[in-house]
């Protein structure tokens, strides 16, 4: 995989460069971008190309509904630098705007998924996108596990490179595939069936794996503890997973009654009316020595239902990691949109925790397979 900075300024000046970014960002109630984390991470590549004199054509999808407009993203990006929004993808307006570009200009195309051919990896759509540019750059790690036209189709048609975000993600997560020892993985999530493969993989590679979030309920239930009305998966964890000596499950939990009052309890004390919403202080204390000794931590998934305000124990673990990182000798890779959102609410700066991955599903798939379709497509 070649990175775009392997080309000289002379090789980029005047060239039309199609940058596949991932600007699928959350929107607030006012219809504007609520979190610019991904925008700031993706802007580095775009700004670099612009300064090299390239004509930068940025493409991304947003949301799940194909009719959703990417215009709010354009407004947010304008706070980072000069950008022209084109409400078109490969039609006359897009072609005309690209033809009128000057060296250093940046344009943002409309939501790629407005064209149904994008998700179908349609060859004709890939050709139309490729016709806009001379060079292709994939900087969209978070969707590199998708086989969409802009991810795997266009690279077949143009000289293709990784952007800086993609390069950094691959480097960081490659280290997480074979972490220095001692190592710790913290894995959360809502559905055990989606996390089962990565937990099994981590149990073979990491010294200890701690399960948190709703998937911890599945492990508690698998070990015979009551879980009340807590969320559990249809796919129950296998006995060999629950009883693996390297697996850490919560030693206490925060349980919410139907009247919304929450209490810290031991797992065996959960009542039928209780809903587990987070871990507890004893679990944090259990993790503390593992974090203190670790040289590498991978973390994907908050400890509790953060959207309902249960972030105190996510924050407590983050504080332990931040202190250990500051002391030196620990590197931490953190991923998953919910994890990062919860950590931002904790107020601990990103640089004090380690590397924040933009990928959720892509991060886990890379850690499971060591590659992704969008990375393979870059050659």
Question: What is the meaning of each model-derived region?
Answer:
Residues 1-379:
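Active-site loop-to-helix "anion-binding N-cap" substructures in soluble metabolic enzymes
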């Amino acid at each position: 995989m070649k990175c775009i900075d392997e080309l000289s300024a002379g090789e980029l000046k005047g060239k039309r460069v199609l940058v596949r970014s991932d600007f699928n960002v959350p929107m607030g109630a006012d219809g504007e971008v609520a979190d610019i984390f991904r925008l700031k991470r993706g802007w580095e590549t775009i700004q670099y190309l612009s300064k090299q004199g390239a004509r930068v054509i940025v493409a991304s999808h947003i949301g799940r509904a194909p009719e959703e407009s990417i215009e709010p993203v354009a407004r947010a990006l304008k706070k980072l630098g000069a950008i022209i929004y084109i409400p078109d993808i490969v039609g006359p307006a897009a072609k005309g705007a690209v033809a009128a570009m000057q060296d250093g200009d940046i344009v943002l195309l409309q939501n790629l998924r407005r064209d149904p051919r994008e998700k179908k990896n349609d060859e004709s759509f890939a050709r139309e996108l490729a016709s806009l540019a001379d060079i292709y750059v994939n900087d969209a790690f978070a969707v590199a596990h998708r086989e969409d036209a802009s991810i795997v189709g266009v690279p077949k048609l143009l000289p293709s490179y990784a952007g800086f975000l993609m390069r950094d993600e691959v480097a960081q997560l490659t280290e997480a595939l074979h972490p220095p020892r001692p190592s710790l993985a913290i894995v959360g999530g809502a559905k055990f069936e989606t996390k089962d493969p990565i937990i099994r993989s981590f149990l073979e590679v990491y010294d200890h794996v701690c399960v948190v979030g709703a998937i911890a309920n599945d492990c508690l239930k698998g070990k015979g503890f009551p879980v009340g009305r807590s969320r559990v998966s249809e796919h129950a964890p296998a006995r060999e997973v629950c009883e693996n000596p390297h697996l850490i499950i919560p030693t206490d939990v925060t349980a919410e009654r139907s009247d919304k009052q929450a209490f810290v309890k031991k797992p065996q004390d959960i009542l039928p009316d209780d809903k587990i919403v987070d871990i507890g202080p004893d679990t944090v204390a259990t993790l503390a020595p593992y974090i203190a000794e670790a040289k590498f931590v991978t973390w994907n998934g908050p400890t509790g239902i953060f959207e309902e305000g249960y972030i105190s124990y996510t924050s407590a673990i983050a504080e332990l990691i931040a202190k250990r990182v500051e002391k030196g000798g620990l590197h931490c890779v953190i991923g998953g949109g919910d994890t990062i959102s919860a950590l931002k609410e904790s107020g601990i700066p990103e640089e004090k925790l380690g590397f924040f991955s933009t990928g959720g599903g892509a991060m886990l798939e890379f850690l499971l397979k060591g590659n992704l379709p969008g990375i393979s497509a870059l050659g």
